[in-house]
Regions:
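P-loop NTP-binding core
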Residues: 1-283
Length: 283
């Protein structure tokens, strides 16, 4: 299982959009995936079409992590049924898994800056039951408080989401320093998987300048491809659709970008993306 936290220091940069875009790409590739919605706003759960019944939300599971039964409390994303019924599903999709550990305001009790080591291990303990998945995506709150640190403690990699703007770039630099300090003290095996430039406006001189600044500051940590601003993204999320099953050329182009981004995220050694996806589907 590869656990990846999707983080940002600043709200409004499209962190949850990147999480759901990567989840959509994983579903299209047939990669068994769990999305853990640690943000108390639970926007990822809504966008993924997760409709919980009697299942515990992730906050309740974190309260008693040793007794938490993850497999019994995850909720399947509504995307799976829709994708399976579309008739155009790629090979391997029938067996694909996209589950959600549903978010709730209850997780907010852990979103404080003074969590001790025992509390930081709560998510790691819950995810001990995640062996059926190849990929776990953790949607973090837009802060560096307890929930984000709990996610980092359970993760193999951290992806930072940033808009190419002055304050977002500065926030990303601070977050990179915070990750380095956190690694030294709590999680020596944690690695920054990279930085996703999101909501990029190709015609904006400011965005072009900030992207060049990000390339200079972060080098190879700036992941490719960049994700352009998607005018209908709120409509897609509001309808609880995956980007891969939304009609139109702009959605199709965005889906291809998330396919490439997922391949680069899971495949840092540079093997061709097509081979990477093929290996995962037929493993």
């Amino acid at each position: 299982v590869q656990v990846v936290s999707i983080s940002s220091l600043k709200g409004g940069v499209g962190k949850t959009s990147v999480t759901t875009g990567l989840a959509s790409a994983a579903l299209a590739a047939g990669i068994p995936t769990l999305v853990v919605d640690l943000d108390p706003h639970a926007d990822a759960s809504t966008a993924l079409g997760a409709r919980p019944g009697d299942q515990q939300d992730i906050g309740r599971m974190l309260k008693a992590p040793r007794r938490a039964r993850l497999a019994e409390n995850v909720v399947p994303s509504g995307w799976v049924e829709r994708a399976s019924g579309s008739g155009g599903a790629p090979a391997g999709l029938a067996e694909a898994i996209l589950d959600v550990a549903v978010g709730s305001a209850y997780t907010g009790i852990y979103d404080r800056p003074d969590l001790g080591r025992r509390d930081l291990r709560r998510l790691s303990t819950v995810l001990a039951g995640a062996e059926q998945y190849e990929l776990v995506l953790v949607d973090c709150p837009p802060s560096l408080n307890g929930l984000t640190r709990m996610a980092w403690s359970a993760s193999d990699k951290v992806v930072l989401v940033a808009e190419p703007g002055l304050f977002s770039v500065a926030g990303t630099e601070r977050t990179m320093r915070a990750i380095q300090l956190f690694r030294q003290e709590f999680a020596p095996n944690l690695s920054p998987a990279g930085i996703v430039a999101n909501r990029v406006r190709t015609g904006s001189a400011e965005h072009t300048f900030r992207l060049a600044e990000m390339e200079s500051m972060f080098g190879e940590l700036l992941l490719s491809p960049h994700i352009p601003e998607q005018a209908n993204w709120q409509q897609i999320q509001g309808a609880a659709h995956s980007i891969h099953h939304w009609p139109g050329e702009s959605a199709k182009s965005a889906a291809a970008l998330f396919d490439a981004l997922l391949a680069n995220l899971l495949n840092p050694d540079g093997r061709p993306a097509a081979a990477q996806v093929r290996d995962r589907i037929h493993r």
